[in-house]
Amino acid sequence: MKIVAPVMPRNVEEAQSIDVSKYQDVNLIEWRADFLPKEDIVSVAPAIFEKFAGREIIFTLRTSQEGGHITLSDQEYVDLIKEINAIYNPDYIDFEYFSHKAVFHEMLDFPNLVLSYHNFDETPENLMEAFSEMTKLAPRVVKIAVMPQSEQDVLDLMNYTRGFKTLNPEQEFATMSMGRLGRLSRLAGDVVGSSWTFVSLDQASAPGQVSLADMKRILHILESED
């Protein structure tokens, strides 16, 4: 299970002052570009990609529809993604599939897609259908993050992940049940078939994230021999 940590600068000065040494034990860097004004994203990009040269980067524009900090039309969203991809070719591009279906056809040739779905309110009854629809598109990663209202919601998310991974062993999944109640799902990726777990450093990017230091300790215990 790979550890993912976010960088969330709000301006170019913050981007230039990122302490990359804090990320040495992280496998993937997620640049949450939605913390910037939309007109600043392209100009701040060089600082991010230079800071983390040689590291695997996920470019994410988390929009307000899915708990993020930026509001964009479908076309603005896809155009920004395509511009960043054309210049920097990040290892992964997050695409909010259900929020921007109307422009998904423009992403069909992208080999680095993380098709994502986030629901900060609930674990929807049609969660299995969401898994199925995104898995059929065979992106590089299927990412699902939902908010549990009960213990059963957490178990459902974990069971669906295990089931779809078993049926689609070549497909990568990154799934999590959010909040304190769902924290167990962030630790059990190796059991259920989720390839990534998202951690916090100075500031969490989603509710229920475990700190990098705690995650390292937990994984050491889980992965150690008897």
From Swiss-Prot:
It holds the Pfam family DHquinase_I. GO terms for molecular function: 3-dehydroquinate dehydratase activity. 3-dehydroquinate binds at E30, W31, R32, R62, R186, S205, Q209. GO terms for biological process: 3,4-dihydroxybenzoate biosynthetic process; amino acid biosynthetic process; aromatic amino acid family biosynthetic process; chorismate biosynthetic process. Keywords: Amino-acid biosynthesis, Aromatic amino acid biosynthesis, Lyase, Schiff base. It is an enzyme of class 4 (lyase). Its EC number is 4.2.1.10. The active site is at H118, K143. It catalyses: 3-dehydroquinate = 3-dehydroshikimate + H2O. Coiled coil: none annotated. Pathway: Metabolic intermediate biosynthesis; chorismate biosynthesis; chorismate from D-erythrose 4-phosphate and phosphoenolpyruvate: step 3/7. It comes from the Bacteria. Homodimer. PANTHER family: 3-DEHYDROQUINATE DEHYDRATASE. Belongs to the type-I 3-dehydroquinase family. Involved in the third step of the chorismate pathway, which leads to the biosynthesis of aromatic amino acids. Catalyzes the cis-dehydration of 3-dehydroquinate (DHQ) and introduces the first double bond of the aromatic ring to yield 3-dehydroshikimate. This is 3-dehydroquinate dehydratase.
